[in-house]
Amino acid sequence: MIDFKSIIGKVATGATLTRDEATAAFDAMMSGEATPSQMGALLMGLRVRGETVDEIAGAVSAMRAKMLTVTAPPDAVDVVGTGGDGSGSVNVSTCAAFIVAGCGAPVAKHGNRALSSRSGAADVLAALGVKIDITPDQVGRCIAEAGIGFMFAPTHHPAMKNVGPTRVELATRTIFNMLGPLSNPAGVKRQMVGVFSRQWVQPLAQVLKNLGSEAVWVVHGSDGLDEITISGPTFVAALKDGEITTFEITPEDAGLPRAPAESLKGGDAEANAAALKGVLQGKPSPYRDVALLNAGATLIVAGRAGDLKEAVALGAQSIDSGAAAARLAKLIAVSNTAE
């Protein structure tokens, strides 16, 4: 058993933890072996100093070791945002997930209810009629039969109940805001991850590389969006063939028009569900464009397209042929017929 006090003492001096120390510390927290004050001290110490790649990788390893896993094809992909960007935008990655699935790439989407916005992935999917509180085996069946499955974080990460109250009391962003998107229960090795701050774009790509991911885009919009934005440039760190490159992309790179960030403002779960349905029905809008851009990046990560223009054209075909909407209909049907 780890000496948690010595870990806090180390962080208090400004020293960094090794990956193994971080794994042990977060294992203790999620096992209920650390007291609330010890957890709060460590989380705030890391936040104030700034978490390192090794510390995040160690924490993710601890979280992955405790999660309830889902069986998915080896080429499955996730498209997910950290949330916490304060934008109150429509559900971009959720909409993108159906577009990607409509292109034939298996999607193992991981998400939760809203933390800071009015509608998280789980909220909007539930409003659409998807059953979200299903077992890991049932999620696997959704991926196999519908080409897409949704893994509701609390179901797959039961050990998080031990840190939940401390997180609520701290009421500020901690390392845990980054761990969820990096701890996909289907063990996907291809990820499109949006983050709430530019400072984390390159480090999180490095974390995923260190943890064995094969193809990754980590993105942050210049307007603060934890997705690829259509209001301006987006900062990207891409992992491909073991190498990480950083670059910027714009909507024009994909042949899409710009639109102000305000055009992506969302509402509650019902309003966002209606907007998502509108996109899948083929209605032109800035929401369609931003969903296509994020789906396009995910298709590149999935190995289905070589560049953004090609990827966005594939995504548009997925919508306009009805394939994306068919994936949603199938997910609703399969998730509600639990065996």
Curated annotation (Swiss-Prot):
GO biological process per UniProt: L-tryptophan biosynthetic process
InterPro entries recorded: Anthranilate_Pribosyl_Tfrase, Glycosyl_Trfase_fam3, Glycosyl_Trfase_fam3_N_dom, Glycosyl_Trfase_fam3_N_dom_sf, Nuc_phospho_transferase
Amino acids binding 5-phospho-alpha-D-ribose 1-diphosphate: 81, 84-85, 89, 91-94, 109-117, 121
Cofactor binding, per record: Binds 2 magnesium ions per monomer.
The entry's keywords: Amino-acid biosynthesis, Aromatic amino acid biosynthesis, Glycosyltransferase, Magnesium, Metal-binding, Transferase, Tryptophan biosynthesis
Any one GO MF annotation of this record: anthranilate phosphoribosyltransferase activity
Gene3D superfamilies from the UniProt entry: Nucleoside phosphorylase/phosphoribosyltransferase catalytic domain, Transferase, Pyrimidine Nucleoside Phosphorylase, Chain C
Cofactor(s) required, per the database record: Mg(2+)
Pfam family name, one: Glycos_trans_3N
Positions contributing to Mg(2+) 1 binding: S93, E227
Complex and partners: Homodimer.
Function: Catalyzes the transfer of the phosphoribosyl group of 5-phosphorylribose-1-pyrophosphate (PRPP) to anthranilate to yield N-(5'-phosphoribosyl)-anthranilate (PRA).
NCBIfam families (UniProt xref): trpD
Protein name as annotated: Anthranilate phosphoribosyltransferase
The species this protein was found in: Rhodopseudomonas palustris (strain BisA53)
